[in-house]
Amino acid sequence: MEQKTEHNVTLHGFNNLTKSLSFNMYDICYTKTKEEREAYIEYIDEQYNAERLTSILKNVSDIIGAHVLNVAKQDYVPQGASVTFLVSEGPVVEVPTESYEESPGPLPENVVLQLDKSHITVHTYPEYHPTEGISTFRADIDVSTCGEISPLKALNYLIRSFDTDLMTIDYKVRGFTRDIHGYKLFIDHDISSIQNYIPEEIKELFHMIDVNVYQDNIFHTKCKRREFDLNNYLFGYTKDRLTPEEQEDITKQLQIEMDEIYYGKNFVN
C-alpha cells in the first residue's frame, strides 16, 4: 500500500513512526497540620479519581483519533489512581492538513478525525514532606501514537484539564518509515519546539525552558507558573489568618519547592 505525506512523499506501506508524548503536571499546596494534609489528599483523590481521569483520556483519544479497545482503571488505597487505554493500531483513513503544523491542537468538541493508534495511560502520585508543610500532587500522562497524527495535538486539551503549577513535557519520535524508493524517514513533520503546540494565552502564564536534541528527535519543555499568590497554595483558609512572618516563611518554602521541581535539583540540604 502507498501513502502520501503532506510533503508529497509517497510511503512504502503504512507510516511506522512511533510518536510519544509524556505530560507531567504538579500541584503544590501548603498543609501545616496532619488534618490539613489528609483533607488535601482526600480532595485531590476525589478531584482526580479514576472516573474523571477516564473521561480526560477518552477526550484525548478522540483528539488523536484513536479507537478504544479496552479501558483498565483503578483507584488505589490509601490514595492515587491509574487508567490505561488500549487502542487499536491501523491504517490512516483520513489525515487533516493541520496534523503536520506546529500549532495548538483542538478541544474535544472540534474533533472529527477517525484514526487508529496504540496506547494512552495516566497515573497519579500524591505525596507530602515528612516534617514540613508541603504536599504535592503529580499526574503523569503518556500518549503514544503510531502513524501520521502527532500526540502533541492533545497537549492543549491536557493543559486545560489540570490546575497545574508546574509542567514537564517530553516528546520523541522513534522508528522509521520508508518511501517507495526505500529511503528511511525518521520524522515526518517539522518541529522546533513543543511550545509551538501551546496557545499564547497559556504560554503567558508560565516561565518556559526548552532542552531539545534535534538530531535525535527529542524535545523537552518545562513550565513554571509566573505569578505567585499565596492564597492559591493554602488549603481551607486564606493568608489573612497568618501573620506577616508566617506568610513570608510559607511563601519561601513553597517557592523553594517549586524551584527544586522546575530545575530538577535540591537547593536546601
Swiss-Prot record:
Its EC number is 4.1.1.50. Transmembrane segments: none annotated. The keyword tRNA-binding does not apply. Binds 1 pyruvoyl group covalently per subunit. Keywords: Autocatalytic cleavage, Decarboxylase, Lyase, Polyamine biosynthesis, Pyruvate, S-adenosyl-L-methionine, Schiff base, Spermidine biosynthesis, Zymogen. The record marks 117-118 as: Cleavage (non-hydrolytic). GO terms for molecular function: adenosylmethionine decarboxylase activity. The keyword Lyase applies. GO terms for biological process: spermidine biosynthetic process. Pfam families: AdoMet_dc. Belongs to the prokaryotic AdoMetDC family. Type 2 subfamily. HAMAP family: AdoMetDC_2. Catalyzes the decarboxylation of S-adenosylmethionine to S-adenosylmethioninamine (dcAdoMet), the propylamine donor required for the synthesis of the polyamines spermine and spermidine from the diamine putrescine. This is S-adenosylmethionine decarboxylase proenzyme. It comes from Brevibacillus brevis (strain 47 / JCM 6285 / NBRC 100599). The lineage of its organism: Bacteria, Bacillati, Bacillota, Bacilli, Bacillales. The gene is speD.
